[in-house]
Amino acid sequence: MVKRIDPHTHSAYSDGTDTPAQLLAIAAQAGLDTIALTDHDTTIGWDEAADAVADTGVSLIRGAEMSCSSSGITVHLLAYLFDPASPGLVDNFRRTREDRETRAARMVENLSADYPITLDDVLAFAPEGGPVGR
């Protein structure tokens, strides 16, 4: 029997638009057997996704799309089944989140020269615990 798998999905905790539970429901409606939740540099949606497995029948692979840099080159690495409490990963995710927050503040500052917008306006749209992106 052929299994239908999507090994690369994002929820609203990253650059997707659906909650992890909604993502699993959509996967079930699409006839998928398994999805991997691979939000950018976070595992915050894992528990919510795991709670939705019983309701949807879709298997979950826990993962993340990790931002990695070396010698000025940045790549996104898909990683699966790792320990989310690993001190190195926790530190990497924290640094990446801080970098994104700094970048978002700069973007809002630049935009505010021509548009009436504040960082608080932008943060109001971010899911609790989720990232502020472009």
Question: At which residue positions do the language-model features occur?
Answer:
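Extended substrate/RNA-proximal surfaces in nucleic-acid metabolism proteins
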Residues: 52-134
